[in-house]
Amino acid sequence: MKISAILTVALSMALLSNAAPLEKRRFGQEHSAFVEPLYQKMRDSAQGTNFAGQVGQMSGEAVNALLAAKPACRQQVVADHLVFFAKKMGADTTIADGKTREKDLINIAKQYRTAERNTNQDGKPSFLCGRKPSFKELNGIVQKQDPAATTKPDTPTDATNLDETFDPL
């Protein structure tokens, strides 16, 4: 009985040690050295204003939007929301440095929009968003791609789903 248990454990360990993933995956882009400071800058840009909670929530959603399983337009939607809140801060006369904060947050949104997204496979490009941004400041900006990608990025047919349209609520 003891020998069969020992053999079972030994065989299981041997099999597990030889197991390897079928595909190398490219994860971790949502916490890269490029984007991590942007999340803090997002929060800092609205600190002390009536928009701190909303922009803080967007900084959390910004992390989520870079995940491989998220829809192709989620990153652009977050950037659109950041520009929306930036313009609101710039127009708010109770914020002494509102125009400066507006400019700063728009620049942060532009930088964020260029951030590389995770992909389900190393060397595979992430999907592009198939709709125009809601604000002209983001026109022509798309996310960076995996430098090891050997194909061009696709635009999925579901990139314009209603749940991915800009809605500032």
Which ranges hold each PLM region?
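Fungal secretory targeting signals
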Residues: 1-27
